[in-house]
Amino acid sequence: MGMYSAIPLALPMVLLMVYGLTPSLGHSPRTPDRVSEADIQRLLHGVMEELGIARPRVEYPAHQAMNLVGPQSIEGGAHEGLQHLGPYGNIPNIVAELTGDNIPKDFREDQGYPNPPNPCPVGKTGDGCLEDTPDTAQFSREYQLHQNLYDPEHNYPGASTWNKKLLYEKIKGASQRQKRTVNPYLQGQKLDKVVAKKSVPHFSGEEE
């Protein structure tokens, strides 16, 4: 409590010392244009030390960034390519390349579609895209079920001749799956051969 009550008393004292209005000082009075920033900082630090307040951290202005020595670079980011970072744009970034064993499995060239599905945007036509594609979840599920993930390690029949237009026609002409409207388990049918995780299974040959 005493520390905070002393702060309002200390500030006018600092101002009097800065502007040379203290009568006990024998120096010539200082005008605001003769007071340097270093003088103010020195006085403030002295008052703060007397009051027991921690010294503020030292911050370096941006123009001192040129004084840093040694190679400086920043690695990472969102793969935007070459950038120049820092206050003056003098710190080049390192573009991280995905090579060798560092490449995740999903990034490898052999883990993709040789001819990816490409439905046309609504109301648009163009070469290479499927026109009049049904915008339904069921069609999307069936389309994806019929796709063969291209993988040279496995021998998919006809993978090299995979064609999205033929696939579209095949799905379009396929018989629609019949929806089951009645759930037999809601009608009383029991699940056979299902064991709960924490229960002990009972086998017919065991004695009660």
Swiss-Prot record:
Post-translational events? Proteolytically cleaved in the Golgi by a furin-like convertase to generate bioactive peptides.
Q: Which residues form the signal peptide?
A: 1-26
Q: Which GO terms describe its cellular component?
A: extracellular region; secretory granule
Q: Name one GO molecular function term.
A: unfolded protein binding
Q: Which positions does the record annotate as the modified residue Phosphoserine? A: 204
Its GO biological process annotations read: intracellular protein transport; neuropeptide signaling pathway; peptide hormone processing; regulation of hormone secretion
Q: Cite the entry's keywords alphabetically.
A: Chaperone, Cleavage on pair of basic residues, Disulfide bond, Neuropeptide, Phosphoprotein, Secreted, Signal, Sulfation, Transport
Q: Which compartments does it reside in? A: Secreted
Q: Which domain of life is it from?
A: Eukaryota
Where's it mainly located?
A: secreted
Q: Can you list the disulfide-bonded cysteine pairs?
A: 120-129
Summarizing the function annotation, the protein's role is:
Acts as a molecular chaperone for pcsk2, preventing its premature activation in the regulated secretory pathway. Binds to inactive pcsk2 in the endoplasmic reticulum and facilitates its transport from there to later compartments of the secretory pathway where it is proteolytically matured and activated. Also required for cleavage of pcsk2 but does not appear to be involved in its folding.
Cite the record's note on assembly. Interacts with pcsk2 early in the secretory pathway. Dissociation occurs at later stages.
Family according to the record: Belongs to the 7B2 family.
- Name listed for the protein in its UniProt record: Neuroendocrine protein 7B2
Q: Which lineage do the record's taxonomy fields give for this organism?
A: Eukaryota, Metazoa, Chordata, Craniata, Vertebrata
Gene designation per UniProt: scg5.L
